[in-house]
Curated annotation (Swiss-Prot):
Key words, A-Z: ATP-binding, Helicase, Hydrolase, Nucleotide-binding, Nucleus, Ribosome biogenesis, RNA-binding, rRNA processing
Species the sequence originates in: Yarrowia lipolytica (strain CLIB 122 / E 150)
Protein name from the UniProt record: ATP-dependent RNA helicase DBP6
Helicase ATP-binding domain span: 228-412
Lineage start: Eukaryota, Fungi, Dikarya, Ascomycota, Saccharomycotina
Family: Belongs to the DEAD box helicase family. DDX51/DBP6 subfamily.
Stated role: ATP-binding RNA helicase involved in the biogenesis of 60S ribosomal subunits and is required for the normal formation of 25S and 5.8S rRNAs.
Domain notes: The Q motif is unique to and characteristic of the DEAD box family of RNA helicases and controls ATP binding and hydrolysis.
Amino acid sequence: MFTGVRRFDPTQGGQASPVPFKKVKHEEEESKPETNADEHSEVEYEEESGDDSMDEAEEAKKPVEVKDEEESEDENLTADQKRKKKQEAANLAKRAEEKALERKRKREQHMGEEDSDSEDDLAPIKISGNNKIKLAKGTIRAKGFEELPQTEIYEDKPDESATISRKTQLQTQPILRNATYVEIDDVGSFDEFDLSKNMMKNLDTLGYTKAFSVQKAVIPWLLAQQKLLAPDRKPDLLVSASTGSGKTATYGIPIIEKLRDRIVPRIRAVVVLPTKPLVMQVRDVLENLSKGSSLSVVALRNDRSTKRERAVLETADIVVAAPGRLVEQVKENPELFSYIEFLVVDEADRLLGQDYYDWASVLQNNQQRAQAGKTNLTEHYVRNMQTLIFSATLTANPEHIASMDIHNPGVFVIGSSDSYSIPKSLTEIVTHVSAAEKPLMLCELLVQRDINRGVVFTKSSETAARVARMMEIMDADIFHKDWKIAAVSAETSSVHRRRSMKQFIDGKIDFLVCTDLVSRGIDFVVDNVINYDIPSGKREYVHRVGRTARAGREGNAYTFLTGSGEAKWFREIGEFVGRTQEVDATHINSSHNDGYQEALAKLEEEV
């Protein structure tokens, strides 16, 4: 059964010690006076050695004897050179003295703050009812457990610069300086946007009853830009919003509204996404939004011949594609991609990474070639392309967008001004487990928390396959829940992946055990995500947990931690995500160790 963790402390592997609470101070070595390389070549200063040493400021004035070689060199100097050298040494000594005094002042101030601790600060912490334990990096909630003494881990006071808000830090970056920050709760109605009757009908059919914050902020802005007179170049758009916040409709609605009255079919909008499953998902959404119009939405696919693909593209208005296939078609049929008015980059943090720079330059160079030589109004006019960039982690690496030739962008940060953003309705839970018992603890978690459906993330394809098989064996021999389980990774065939995904979405599979391949590629409704292995990157954590708590729904993200190293890494992740709630900590007990050992033996026989 579940029992409450006494205190989750990432630096100590989350372990709590039942001893009277007291502060433990980290000993720090005194650093030497800061000097540059030239200072070391001229004068050296003795370091204070303890309570009996001279005052630091006085000691800094005392130069060490200069070597004989230097004295012999001084004999060859002119009077002016000697005087100049002496003055430089005096200046160095003065600067070192000032630095020493400043360090001493800070140390005395810090010691004074420590001495001001009251007896109440040193009292044991007790957990009862719904008390919350405040940590430097977050809050852990425990419910209904016995009173336990706690051990606080002393942490140095953060630098004053660390207290500056993330919003203030972002505003120091030129491209984000004038960003508009929008609260996640700031929702509205689509009636406010002056949309066409056909679009309103489609939104009603899709069940879009309210406009989420990203839609309320961005859709009116985009619609207003379409009223600008050509040939003025329209401002580009940068949006930082969490996964599942409604980004597809945010750019889809204005694009379709702009293109719905077009006369001649041409590729006027291109949407680029990192994975094929995500391409198909977005294609479906845009098709539903464009119903009742003559617009054609096409997804580029590898299973179509080049000749057949060209025939489809000749009548397309909106193309949705992964970068690899898009580059092939642009190079093969450059004239078809010469009229682009909208370039949408979704999941931009991944698409604009180092491996993807080429696709952006291919598309932009093709657009520039199409405009080259158009010098007068009698020649065919080619519109400037407006770039719309969406990402859950845009503010983490804004330099990535430099390759996109961004023009006077409108910038919107939705829901959080932090570098990473996770859904507000997400509940995060951590539990410490031993590596040897992780498969057993996973099954116990599912049973004890009554989790009947979810996604389990692992670090590798091999781990995904082994965990899925262990779950099947333990379910058959121990838990008898009749789970339907599928493993999905880069090692599985595309046919198997598509079939497993469809079965999971249709409810025919209960648990999907997978690698990060799925964290960005599929949009499905799931209430529980389990990080069997903690991700190696902060942004991967964002995309994993973003599979749940989508579009305002509640969801849970469980993370297994093995050892203090992973616990420390989890805390570092927490420093960068837009966390709005405390992290829950829980512990799992099991009485099925014998059955678990038998299940391991069966797995080894199969392997």
